[in-house]
Amino acid sequence: MEISGTVLRQVSYVSGYGTHTRSRGLAPRFGVRMGMGSGFCDEGHLRYYQDTKKVLTPKKKLKLLKGFSKLGLASDPEKLAMFYDLQQNLTSDAGDVLLRELEAARAKEKEVKKKRKQEKKAKLKAAKMNCESSSSSSSESSDSDCGCDQVVDMNTFRAGVGVGVGVGVGVVAPAPVEESPLPKTAPIVEDANAHCVAMELCSKNDIYVSSASNGFKNESAVVTSAPQKRIEVCMGNKCKRSGAAALMQEFEKVVGVEGVAVVACKCMGKCKTAPNVKVQNSVDHNSLAQGLDDSVKIPANPLCIGVGLEDVDAIVARYFWESHTDIGMAGAGAATAT
């Protein structure tokens, strides 16, 4: 009994040797080696790189039908038959023909759209160029439209006039010519009432005065209202930022109420680093400047560009020299009286 018990124990120990719960589900290694050593089950990897014919899916063919109807290709009887064939059988070969037709029609439509876009772009470019040319021409012709005969740059004006300008008068008197003396004109006497009446008539719609007065005489007894002398200060955005309001106040201080109005005007189109001033002095070259050199003549209705506060006295003395001289003489007389 003891011998049989020991034999059973040894057999059970030997049979359980080397077993473990984790090693029960492992596959034998020789099976894996056999799987790795076998070849490809089919030749699908070779057919993948071959050129296959493009086959339309039913979804693409339905999309083709919609595009075919939109482009109006159904007007052709032959293509209409293909259209019906494709509607009945979406897997037919008629879809390939219609697809080529549709692609050609789409390419043609794209070409037409491209041409339209180019034409529209060319028209916009031409309109922009015309607008720029018209704006430049309008700015160049603004002097003639507003009655300006000459554009005066104040840098050149300061260099040429600043040396010969006196304290009271800002214009150099021309030397007398002995050979052809200027005809003397009798001064026109105006009283205060007639002057005020004339200024009121100037502000209205050029009313003609048929009755002659003591201050205004004419052979035909019809007198045209004379243009008013005034100084127009540009009030554009650029000129405002460069001190146009202060310049206008300075002109009002210097000119006063001696028949010269200081007003604001719209942008003149030549704004630079300083405000622009348009002078309406109504100079008549035929009667006042005959026989004078061009350098001595006073330009009528000039446009002064780049005007500063230091140029106010010079402009008033240059273009309104008669009234400025009267103002200076009146101030000097008042100073001597005191």
Curated annotation (Swiss-Prot):
Biased segments, Low complexity type: 132-145
Record flagged with keyword Lipid biosynthesis: no
Functional note: Involved in triacylglycerol (TAG) biosynthesis. Catalyzes the acylation of the sn-3 hydroxy group of sn-1,2-diacylglycerol using acyl-CoA. Incorporates preferentially monounsaturated fatty acids (MUFAs), especially oleic acid (C18:1) and to some extent palmitoleic acid (C16:1), into TAGs accumulating in seeds oil. Can also use, with low efficiency, hexadecanoic acid (C16:0), linoleic acid (C18:2) and linolenic acid (C18:3) as acyl-CoA substrates.
Enzyme Commission number(s) of this protein: 2.3.1.20
Positions bound to [2Fe-2S] cluster: C234, C239, C267, C271
Compositionally biased region (Basic residues): 113-126
Pathway this chain belongs to: Glycerolipid metabolism; triacylglycerol biosynthesis
Cofactor(s) demanded: [2Fe-2S] cluster
Species the sequence originates in: Glycine max (Soybean)
Region (Disordered) residue spans: 109-145
Gene3D superfamilies listed in its UniProt record: Glutaredoxin (3.40.30.10)
GO molecular function, one term: diacylglycerol O-acyltransferase activity
Name of the encoding gene: DGAT3-2
Catalytic activity: an acyl-CoA + a 1,2-diacyl-sn-glycerol = a triacyl-sn-glycerol + CoA
Tissue expression pattern: Mostly expressed in flowers, accumulates in stems, seeds and pods and, to a lower extent, in leaves and roots.
Stated name of the protein: Diacylglycerol O-acyltransferase 3-2
